[in-house]
């Protein structure tokens, strides 16, 4: 995704798919820092979903160089949650939406459209 319009379209698509139940939103909680983020931020899993549903094009960081499972693009965002910048990486597959990363950012995020 290179343009703000492409990011807006991606976000609209995943939001519709999640909110209508067409696609499940799967979190990779097996990754320690993703699970730890819920504790560090003092948020519930449902709050995490709401944060993803609130993403805007202005929160877009970049499209990652690699691919999830060698075939699906990964898109990264940042969001301020309880005064912490949270790094969020999402991939859209034909079967669902995968949140690969959701944790406090380890580096400053340079937003593409802010």
For the regions a language model picked out, list residue spans one by one.
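Functional cores of ribonucleases/endoribonucleases
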Residues: 53-96
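Enriched for short, Lys/Arg-rich terminal
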Residues: 91-114
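Compact soluble domain cores
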Residues: 2-5, 9-71
